[in-house]
């Protein structure tokens, strides 16, 4: 369990925020994931976790309700077609429940826990490395999570997996596959259509942008 508990409405102390950032900066440089886990346990006073079949089933139930498989797209001038499509797994939790985020790190052996910007004490675990998503996250979902999921969420997992396979086949380097295969999956999976923080308002806008970018029309 975690012995670090905040009261309702209480903010995560600044020293904890700074230490968390320092820990994340360190693992980015060293790639020492074992030390990263140790540092997180120390920071949030988390007891060591044993990964068992039962804990995996517990995590599966939690992820089914709380986690997200997302695909975002944004303009990037240095990319081949002027935009990038980014798949990501994430799950948020109040710091009082940090142990379940830590359990996910132990199970997946990858990921980062950061403070959610603008929140009092919400943490977010993200995994955005495509190889890790394909080799660690998706197999876990297929083995443990989809059995408890709605048809809509099962389809979402399938779409996410299909996107990763397209990336593996370098479809993002081919204009026609980007436009006709990758971007339609992104469009299907968007949860926040019409939000101002999206790179493109709809599928057609993203497709037209990619086509015209290659022609020098931005």
From Swiss-Prot:
Mg(2+) 1 binds at residues 65-66. One of its GO terms (molecular function) is metal ion binding. Homodimer. The record marks 21, 80, 130, 172 as: Interaction with DNA. The keyword Glycosyltransferase does not apply. Mg(2+) 2 binds at residue 86. Keywords: Chloroplast, DNA-binding, Endonuclease, Hydrolase, Intron homing, Magnesium, Metal-binding, Nuclease, Plastid. Residues 71-75, 90-94, 114-116, 191-199 are annotated as: Interaction with DNA. Belongs to the LAGLIDADG endonuclease family. The keyword Hydrolase applies. One of its GO terms (biological process) is intron homing. InterPro entries: Homing_endonucl, LAGLIDADG_dom, LAGLIDADG_Endonuclease. It comes from the Eukaryota. This is DNA endonuclease I-CeuI. Its EC number is 3.1.-.-. Transmembrane segments: none annotated. It is found in: Plastid, Chloroplast. GO terms for cellular component: chloroplast; mitochondrion. Its cofactor is Mg(2+). It comes from Chlamydomonas moewusii (Chlamydomonas eugametos). Endonuclease involved in intron homing. Recognizes a degenerate sequence of 17-19 bp to produce a staggered cut 5 bp downstream from the CeLSU.5 intron insertion site.
